[in-house]
């Protein structure tokens, strides 16, 4: 039962991260299309946001392995 809970936790975290990353990148591309001169600032902010979003599935995977 613990393996199933771990799989569900990792799967849901990955799903949420995928959706979050997609939204972050799409809004960044939209912003760059509107104001190309802000490309560097927008990309820097995007990378920080993606890193924060990706931290959640990593933490979920660690917790899931601890539950198993």
UniProtKB/Swiss-Prot annotation:
Keywords: ATP synthesis, Cell membrane, CF(0), Hydrogen ion transport, Ion transport, Lipid-binding, Membrane, Transmembrane, Transmembrane helix, Transport
Site, as annotated: Reversibly protonated during proton transport: 54
Topology within the bilayer: Multi-pass membrane protein
Residue ranges of the TM segments: 5-25, 47-67
Cleaved signal peptide residues: none
Compartments reported by the entry: Cell membrane
GO cellular component terms, A-Z: plasma membrane; proton-transporting ATP synthase complex; proton-transporting two-sector ATPase complex, proton-transporting domain
GO molecular function list: lipid binding; proton-transporting ATP synthase activity, rotational mechanism
InterPro entries: ATP_synth_csu_bac/chlpt, ATP_synth_F0_csu, ATP_synth_F0_csu_DDCD_BS, ATP_synth_F0_csu_sf, ATPase_proteolipid_c-like_dom, F/V-ATP_Csub_sf
Domain of life: Bacteria
Protein's job: F(1)F(0) ATP synthase produces ATP from ADP in the presence of a proton or sodium gradient. F-type ATPases consist of two structural domains, F(1) containing the extramembraneous catalytic core and F(0) containing the membrane proton channel, linked together by a central stalk and a peripheral stalk. During catalysis, ATP synthesis in the catalytic domain of F(1) is coupled via a rotary mechanism of the central stalk subunits to proton translocation. Key component of the F(0) channel; it plays a direct role in translocation across the membrane. A homomeric c-ring of between 10-14 subunits forms the central stalk rotor element with the F(1) delta and epsilon subunits.
Subunit description: F-type ATPases have 2 components, F(1) - the catalytic core - and F(0) - the membrane proton channel. F(1) has five subunits: alpha(3), beta(3), gamma(1), delta(1), epsilon(1). F(0) has three main subunits: a(1), b(2) and c(10-14). The alpha and beta chains form an alternating ring which encloses part of the gamma chain. F(1) is attached to F(0) by a central stalk formed by the gamma and epsilon chains, while a peripheral stalk is formed by the delta and b chains.
PANTHER family: ATP SYNTHASE LIPID-BINDING PROTEIN, MITOCHONDRIAL, ATPASE PROTEIN 9
Family: Belongs to the ATPase C chain family.
Protein name per its UniProtKB record: ATP synthase subunit c
Annotated source species: Oceanobacillus iheyensis (strain DSM 14371 / CIP 107618 / JCM 11309 / KCTC 3954 / HTE831)
Gene: atpE
């Amino acid at each position: 039962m613990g393996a199933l809970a771990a799989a569900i936790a990792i799967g849901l975290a990955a799903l949420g991260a995928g959706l979050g990353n997609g939204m972050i990148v799409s809004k960044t591309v939209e912003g760059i299309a509107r104001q190309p001169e802000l490309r560097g600032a927008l990309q820097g902010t995007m990378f920080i946001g993606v890193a924060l979003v990706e931290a959640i599935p990593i933490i979920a995977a660690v917790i899931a392995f601890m539950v198993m």
